[in-house]
């Protein structure tokens, strides 16, 4: 340990005489023996030199505590003069990099290489001889620092043959370095290459050959150059000299003996040695944490751009973003062991050296939340005052400029806090003592020091549940090591070049382990195991393919010749108790309670399993992952006592579910370890370690039913757990349960896990891997979506392509947006030639392909007989590439039907070859050549091919804006000659560049993804189109439906024509339309008859075949023929007794009794209220319950959609949606809910009723009817902000001058049948004034879930408003039947109008009243707003609809023009009057 207390201590001990040094060691040994009951190893006397004694003391107690013990011992020895001089020297030595001296108020100056360790030479005691000085000088470093490390390493290793010699990181970091390489050099960061073939992410360096020794020499040379430039030498592995890393056992952590250190950890590698082993991590800045939707969704291109992440350097964490604003809160989020805590501490240390944020922050404070949780009450002033690095300035002065303060909160999610929003209970002043969580809640809630900045580390992405005030935070995900960083890590860990090469080669040859090593903690674990084998001169072997087996290997090596089975069981029990109690620090009493005494504790400390924290004395596992690993072993080892009839796996499941909750269950390392330990290999290793036979009751296959209930098909964490088992039989059974999958994959490790598990699924049809395309509002059925921010290396492309060889059901592969090397393309083409590869669609848009790649693709297509669609858009293929493809496409055996070559750098030179394909290919039906410079010459050549009698093409994509008028006329003539041919153009030029790779392939699908995105999750027509695909002509249902598939209004490059208003055309009129209770179908609204209001019985006659939707209920029918249907809304109460057992099912929707002619209904879409948006609920758990005379029968639905359950060819009886549950999981099911607000005006006051219910139309209707009886009127307000949870309690509050008491103040979200009394809150307002603000919050964490402003205008019925110029009035009953323009294109307008608010503003006061305007705005999506607007328009006359048409024309001219143009082609509308 170069410098700091170690250097000073070594200097003064070297000055002691031999007899004094011996006495010094004996006194220390006596002190240590007096504490041996606490598990400390007694100090060992008879060290031969002061240097050795200093090394031992620092290794055993930590720098600061070793220094304090030395001072105290010198006083006992009577060396008061030496003690005083040492204290004085320490107090005036700010140059020590890690001494407890105070930094200056300004940015710390950067030390030069000659000053790193020199100051303590001048602190030698008076009378120090020249010889002794020379003896010290011999140990000083040269400019590179290498000689110092060599000497200190040698001394430390010789002095401690039996002591631990490996320091370990905190809960988030391995012993080896894991932080970002920005601290290595503060010049400009390395610029990423723009070449599309780059195999590494920005910032990775030195792709050198490890076999030549150049790589190793290059690293050492770079370290020397840094030192020569004036930077301190950078780092050995976690603080111990490199040569000391010859044992498996790491040290416990010595901590400095100050109160500050009991709260804010200072770790033992806090020195130059650690920094020199620094290895770069990948940091990905995101607009939102992974798996969370953005707050505001805009059009699809903007939406994609908003959610695209980018790699970021640590120096830019607090830099301005695209909005030029600098963030105040930065959140470092990542998996366990990924390096977050190390990175956080490095920020503090780099700032202290003047290398980071010196111009931004004057003070930086690091707080470990693990330690902070131990404090009962503390004020911010006390916390800062106890920070050993704080300046001597008064606290008031430090806090006078909060904008210059940075608080680092490490592991904020570890203690299980809920850091509430500001309230009266939170502290408002920095001097006020508070519980630690309240203090942090006040800081983050901005009730104190609102201008301060924060750097927060956490595992979970659900921090907004813990800290509700994080809306403006900058999210940065720590992805781990890149390919080259992993390699560099190995070369820095092993200081011997030959050892480094051997270890690196061995691990890289194990592809699974090499992928797992992107997690720094796993890299450290692998290196440590190999180092131990080298030390023992054993043959190097490391066959682990999972993290579980690697941990078992580590433990087995540490336990050689040390049978500690019973003691290990006690340690496992301690770990499990900590997991249940969210506890990571254990007192000596905690250990004794589990049978762990001083000697055993000392053994575990030396083995590197536990670490000690001296003041106050406590212990923790060396890493939180180790605690989770031992906790998992505790579950497996637990005996059968007290288990009763429950299976072991159920007990294990209940314990982990209790500890982590259903949302965190599969993301927890404990669950992964548990499944890994239950695998065959895991059981064998555990039996060898514990020398026992494990219980036969713990069979991995027993987990299958429970996992099928709990596993989330869109959860990568679930696949991580399955991967740990690597059991084919187990995986086949579990994966067969998945019917559709969708997930986000961003690293080699995640890709490995995903592709491994997919091999065992029989239902996955589509595999999509697109860079930067994280969020989608809809998922295609049976689809896996893979997203990456770092280019996949060739080795892992091969792993991915191996899936195609074994998964015969995979039909579609989308790799758009990923940079493919030439080697990767060759691997893919070899796969395409395999007979077992049955791909039908391949999308490679924006993959950086070249003409040479086209040659390989043509070769791959030669043997493939199944591929029908190929998308190569946005690649610079050039004419040469197109010619290679044409050679294959001309062959009669080629089955390709669709080829997309958008923006591929093509010119007229390749058009002759393309024309020959058009005239020769028997299968090609669609060719997209947009955004290529074909000009008139090239297009004329294409026309010759199109006129050939053998041409089968029916769709041709061309940009016509660059063509001459003569050429355009020729194309129109060609379309007349060939009626089946459609020449389309739907992309704006320059929308995308060849490297962007947006969803070009899906844009041209018969049902485009662009269209699906705009339709959104609530558009019923999307369900209709799917349901009618086989038997119905969609164009008959929605006459203009295919227009949306042909073009997009925002990208049509045509001039706007002057289209007259439909009001001026005498043949356009309206027909009588229905009310909100009507169905909507192919012919418009269909009236619904109320047969029996008391029984909620309705009758409707569907006049023709087609799809019909009931907006008020969400119910949908797909009819084969005209038929009359009766619908009765029932109550569940009378049938619940037939559900056995009751607790295993949850009611998830209304109960309906439908009567219809058998066979007349093709499909029915029944609404449900389970929130599926986040992918937290397994859709296979849904069942349709039929109640017949013989009892309840369950039917598996044909499919589960976002808001509906679909039954095909249904048989009818009372039926409703149920969700299968497990014990105690009800509170984890997200529910779509609504807040119903009613009011009644009295002379003196206004009475309000507020309901919080699941979104069930039958319950809502029952409440409406009840409130109407008491003359209450509903006020329409938006639904809750997020899904809520059954059984949770929510508080209702309000603010306003006339607001009276709310009774009750709490509501529980629960399901009560429509016939039961529903829970509601009642309150009175005496004087409404300008309005009252109502809020509903989660009682547990005070999270705001609903908010609304009630204004006086809300209380006035619409009929009382003064009608404006053209307020909507009913249409005359004798109006002709031809639909108005806005009615004819109703579904198109609902799906594609994006600027709804602008349209509403134009209608406000002219067509819409204030109440109607707010009702429309209250809907939560644009399609819902448009649908509500159209429900109001049903009673409008022609002038009102003309007003809507005019507003739409002004807001969306391209859309209106397109609808007119397409309608005129079909004879539906004239182009002019």
UniProtKB/Swiss-Prot annotation:
The modification Phosphothreonine is found at residues 112, 114, 129, 178, 180. Changing residue 1249 to A: Complete loss of autocatalytic processing and IL1B release. Autocatalytic processing cannot be restored by treatment with hydroxylamine. PROSITE patterns: CARD, DAPIN, FIIND, LRR, NACHT. Changing residue 1437 to R: Abolished formation of an inflammasome filament together with PYCARD/ASC. Changing residue 1454 to D: Abolished formation of an inflammasome filament together with PYCARD/ASC. Widely expressed. Abundantly expressed in primary immune cells (isoform 1 and isoform 2), including in neutrophils, monocytes/macrophages, dendritic cells (mostly Langerhans cells), and B- and T-lymphocytes (at protein level). Strongly expressed in epithelial cells lining the glandular epithelium, such as that of the gastrointestinal tract (stomach, small intestine, colon), the respiratory tract (trachea and bronchi), and the endometrial and endocervical glands, gallbladder, prostate, and breast (at protein level). Keywords: ATP-binding, Cytoplasm, Disease variant, Ectodermal dysplasia, Host-virus interaction, Hydrolase, Immunity, Inflammasome, Inflammatory response, Innate immunity, Leucine-rich repeat, Necrosis, Nucleotide-binding, Nucleus, Phosphoprotein, Protease, Repeat, Ubl conjugation. Changing residue 1387 to R: Does not affect formation of an inflammasome filament together with PYCARD/ASC. Interacts (via LRR repeats) with BCL2 and BCL2L1 (via the loop between motifs BH4 and BH3); these interactions reduce NLRP1 inflammasome-induced CASP1 activation and IL1B release, possibly by impairing NLRP1 interaction with PYCARD. Interacts with NOD2; this interaction is enhanced in the presence of muramyl dipeptide (MDP) and increases IL1B release. Interacts with EIF2AK2/PKR; this interaction requires EIF2AK2 activity, is accompanied by EIF2AK2 autophosphorylation and promotes inflammasome assembly in response to danger-associated signals. (Microbial infection) Interacts with vaccinia virus protein F1. This is NACHT, LRR and PYD domains-containing protein 1. It comes from Homo sapiens (Human). The gene is NLRP1.
């Amino acid at each position: 340990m170069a410098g700091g207390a170690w250097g000073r201590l070594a200097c003064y001990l070297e000055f002691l005489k031999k007899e004094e040094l011996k006495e010094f060691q004996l006194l220390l040994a006596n002190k240590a023996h007096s504490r041996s009951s606490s598990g400390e190893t007694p100090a060992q006397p008879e060290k031969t030199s002061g240097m050795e004694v200093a090394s031992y003391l620092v290794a055993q107690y930590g720098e600061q505590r070793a220094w304090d013990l030395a001072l105290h011992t010198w006083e006992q020895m009577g060396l008061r003069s030496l003690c005083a001089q040492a204290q004085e020297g320490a107090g005036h030595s700010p140059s020590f990099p890690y001494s407890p001296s105070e930094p200056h108020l300004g940015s710390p100056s950067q030390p030069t290489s000659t000053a790193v360790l020199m100051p303590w030479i001048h602190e030698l005691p008076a009378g120090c001889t020249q010889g002794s000085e020379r003896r010290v000088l011999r140990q000083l470093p040269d400019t590179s620092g290498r000689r110092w490390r060599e000497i200190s390493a040698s001394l430390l290793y010789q002095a401690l043959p039996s002591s631990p010699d490996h320091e370990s990181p905190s809960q988030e970091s391995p012993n080896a370095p894991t932080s970002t390489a920005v601290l290595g050099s503060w010049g400009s960061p390395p610029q990423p290459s723009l070449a599309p073939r780059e195999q590494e992410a920005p910032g990775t360096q030195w792709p050198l050959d490890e076999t030549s020794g150049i790589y190793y020499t290059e690293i050492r040379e770079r370290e020397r150059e840094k030192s020569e430039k004036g930077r301190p030498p950078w780092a050995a592995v976690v603080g111990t000299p490199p040569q000391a890393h010859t044992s498996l056992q790491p040290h416990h952590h010595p901590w400095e003996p100050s109160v500050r250190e009991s709260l804010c950890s200072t770790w033992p590698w806090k020195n130059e040695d650690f920094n020199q082993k620094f290895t770069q991590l990948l940091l990905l800045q995101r607009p939102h944490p992974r798996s969370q939707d953005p707050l505001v969704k805009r059009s699809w291109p903007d939406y994609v751009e908003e959610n695209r992440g980018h790699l970021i350097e640590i120096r830019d964490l607090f830099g301005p973003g695209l909005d030029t604003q600098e963030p105040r809160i930065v959140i470092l989020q990542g998996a366990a062991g990924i390096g977050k805590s190390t990175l956080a501490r490095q920020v503090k240390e780099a700032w202290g050296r003047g290398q980071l944020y010196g111009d931004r922050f004057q003070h930086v404070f690091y707080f470990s939340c693990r330690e902070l949780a131990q404090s009962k009450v503390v004020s911010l002033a006390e916390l800062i005052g106890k920070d050993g690095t704080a300046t001597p300035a008064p606290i008031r002065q430090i806090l006078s400029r909060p904008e210059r303060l940075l608080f680092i909160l490490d592991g904020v999610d570890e203690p299980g806090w809920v850091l509430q929003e500001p309230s009266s209970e939170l502290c408002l002043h920095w001097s006020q003592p508070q519980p630690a969580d309240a203090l942090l809640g006040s800081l983050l809630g901005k009730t104190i020091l609102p201008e301060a900045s924060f750097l927060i580390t956490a595992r979970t992405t659900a921090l907004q549940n813990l800290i509700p005030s994080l809306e403006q935070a900058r999210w940065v995900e720590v992805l781990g090591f890149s390919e080259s960083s992993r390699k560099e890590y190995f070369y820095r860990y092993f200081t011997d070049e030959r050892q480094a090469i051997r270890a690196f080669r061995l691990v890289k040859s194990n592809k699974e382990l090499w992928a797992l090593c992107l997690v720094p903690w796993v890299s450290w674990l692998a290196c440590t195991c190999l180092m131990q084998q080298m030390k023992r001169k054993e043959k190097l072997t490391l066959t682990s393919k999972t993290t579980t087996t690697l941990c078992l290997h580590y433990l087995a090596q540490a336990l050689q010749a040390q049978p500690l089975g019973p003691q290990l069981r006690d340690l496992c029990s301690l770990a499990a108790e900590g997991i249940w109690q969210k506890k990571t620090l254990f007192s000596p009493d905690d250990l004794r309670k589990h049978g762990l005494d001083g000697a055993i504790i000392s053994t575990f400390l030396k083995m590197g399993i536990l670490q000690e924290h001296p003041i106050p004395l406590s212990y923790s596992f060396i890493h939180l992952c180790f605690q989770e690993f031992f906790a998992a072993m505790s579950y497996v080892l637990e005996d059968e006592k007290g288990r009763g009839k429950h299976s072991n796996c159920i007990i294990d499941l209940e314990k982990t579910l209790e500890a982590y909750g259903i949302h965190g269950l599969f993301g927890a390392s404990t669950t992964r370890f548990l499944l890994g330990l239950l695998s065959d290999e895991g059981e064998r290793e555990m039996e060898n370690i514990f020398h026992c036979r494990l219980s036969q009751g713990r069979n991995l296959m027993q987990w299958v039913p429970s996992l099928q209930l709990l596993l989330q098909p869109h959860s990568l964490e679930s696949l991580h757990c399955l991967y740990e088992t690597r059991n084919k039989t187990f995986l086949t059974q579990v994966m067969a349960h998945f019917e559709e999958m969708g997930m986000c994959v961003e690293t080699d490790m995640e890709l490995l896990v995903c592709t491994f598990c997919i091999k065992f699924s029989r239902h996955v049809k589509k595999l999509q891997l697109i860079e930067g395309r994280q969020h989608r509002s809809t998922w295609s059925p049976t689809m896996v979506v893979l997203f990456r921010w770092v280019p996949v290396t060739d080795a892992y492309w091969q792993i991915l392509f191996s899936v195609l060889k074994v998964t015969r059901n995979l039909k579609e592969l989308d790799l758009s947006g990923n940079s493919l090397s030439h080697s990767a393309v060759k691997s893919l083409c070899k796969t395409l030639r395999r007979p077992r590869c049955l791909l039908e669609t391949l999308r490679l848009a924006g993959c950086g392909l070249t003409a040479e790649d086209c040659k390989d693709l043509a070769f791959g297509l030669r043997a493939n007989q199944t591929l029908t669609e190929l998308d190569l858009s946005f690649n610079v293929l050039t004419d040469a590439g197109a010619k290679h493809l044409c050679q294959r496409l001309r062959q009669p055996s080629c089955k390709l039907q669709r080829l997309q070559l958008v923006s591929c750098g093509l010119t007229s030179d390749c058009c002759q070859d393309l024309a020959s394909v058009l005239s020769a290919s028997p299968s090609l039906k669609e060719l997209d050549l947009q955004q290529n410079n074909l000009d008139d010459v090239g297009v004329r050549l294409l026309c010759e091919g199109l006129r050939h009698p053998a041409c089968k093409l029916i769709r041709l994509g061309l940009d016509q804006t660059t063509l001459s008028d003569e050429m355009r006329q020729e194309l129109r003539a060609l379309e007349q000659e060939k009626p089946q041919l459609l020449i389309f153009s739907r992309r704006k030029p320059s929308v995308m560049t060849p490297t962007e790779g947006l969803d070009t392939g899906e844009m041209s699908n018969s049902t485009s993804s662009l269209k699906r995105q705009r339709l959104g999750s609530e558009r019923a027509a999307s369900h209709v189109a799917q349901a009618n695909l086989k038997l119905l002509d969609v164009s008959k249902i929605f006459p203009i439906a295919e227009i949306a598939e042909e073009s997009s209004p925002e990208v049509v490059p045509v001039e706007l024509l002057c289209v007259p208003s439909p009001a001026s055309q005498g043949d356009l009129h309206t027909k009588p339309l229905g009310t909100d209770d009507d169905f909507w179908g192919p012919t418009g609204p269909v009236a619904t008859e109320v047969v029996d209001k008391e029984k909620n019985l309705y009758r409707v006659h569907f006049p023709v075949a087609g799809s019909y939707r009931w907006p008020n209920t969400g119910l949908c029918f797909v009819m084969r023929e005209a038929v009359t249907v009766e619908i009765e809304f029932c109550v569940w109460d009378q049938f619940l007794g037939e559900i056995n057992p009751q607790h295993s099912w949850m009611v998830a929707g209304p109960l309906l009794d439908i009567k219809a002619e058998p066979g007349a209904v093709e499909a029915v879409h029944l609404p449900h209220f389970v929130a599926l948006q986040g992918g937290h609920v397994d859709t296979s758990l849904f069942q349709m319950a039929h109640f017949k005379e013989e009892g309840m029968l369950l039917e598996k639905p044909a499919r589960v959609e976002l808001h509906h359950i679909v039954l095909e060819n249904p048989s009818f009886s009372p039926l409703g949606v149920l969700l299968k549950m497990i014990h105690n999981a009800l509170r984890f099911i997200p529910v779509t809910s609504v807040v119903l607000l009613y009011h009644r005006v009295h002379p003196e006051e206004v009475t309000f009723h507020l309901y919080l219910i699941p979104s069930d139309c039958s319950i809502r209707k029952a409440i409406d009817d009840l409130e109407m009886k008491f003359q209450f009127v509903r006020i329409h307000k938006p639904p809750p902000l997020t899904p809520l949870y059954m059984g949770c309690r929510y508080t209702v509050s309000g603010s306003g001058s006339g607001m009276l008491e709310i009774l009750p103040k709490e509501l529980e979200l629960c399901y009560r049948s429509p016939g039961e009394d529903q829970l509601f809150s009642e309150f009175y307002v005496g004087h409404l004034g300008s309005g009252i603000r109502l809020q509903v919050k989660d009682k547990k964490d005070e999270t705001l879930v609903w908010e609304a402003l009630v204004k006086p205008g809300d209380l006035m019925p619409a009929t009382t408003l003064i009608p404006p110029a053209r307020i909507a009035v009913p249409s005359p009953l004798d109006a002709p039947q031809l639909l108005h323009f806005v009615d004819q294109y109703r579904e198109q307008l609902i799906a594609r109008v994006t600027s709804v608010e602008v349209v509403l503003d134009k209608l406000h006061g002219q067509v819409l009243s204030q109440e109607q305007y707010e009702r429309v705005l209250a809907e939560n999506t644009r399609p819902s707003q448009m649908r509500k607007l159209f429900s109001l328009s049903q009673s409008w006359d022609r002038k009102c609809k003309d007003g809507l048409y005019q507003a739409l024309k002004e807001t969306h001219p391209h859309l209106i023009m397109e609808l007119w143009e397409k309608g005129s082609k079909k004879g539906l509308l004239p182009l002019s009057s």
